[in-house]
Amino acid sequence: MHIKRRFSITKKYSVIYADPPWRYERSKVQGAAEKHYPTMGIDELCALPVPELAAKDCALFLWATFPQLPEALRLIRAWGFRYKTVAFVWLKRNRKSPSWFYGMGYWTRSNAEICLLATKGKPKRQSAGVHQFIISPIEQHSKKPDEVRNKILALMGDLPRVELFARQKTPGWDVWGNEIASDITLAERS
């Protein structure tokens, strides 16, 4: 993924929602995601100036696959956050039937994806009624369910928020990604 080197970030966000284009380093998986979109290695992801986007009190919602869990935890630390919990578990259904979707997996056939919650400072939870499970059909490759944004809004409130690696513009959210017109510019930290 090409990233511009110059940037100026003046707005701070209380909520950062990210679905990184993870590059898999294992030979059996290489190329799967690359067939659909450009991917980034962990060092490239860690170099993004996400810490400069974060407000003093900020919640990060970060999608991770189970094979990339160590990298996701490293990324959380590199961006200046502390891991708290798994915010959401997406249980995937097939597109055209109510049956479960199963990917290839490593040892077992995979289904779920997780969205990790990490914090910087002391963001406040606005609702204790937000549930962790999301049961939703798969859509285009790697696209996450739209309802996640609504759950984040219910959990955190109507705060300044940005979606990184976005594929669509959602009202109330600033976005950054290579598949849409971005509201902000990010570049690697030097």
Predicted feature descriptions by range:
Residues 1-190:
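Class I S-adenosyl-L-methionine-dependent methyltransferase catalytic core
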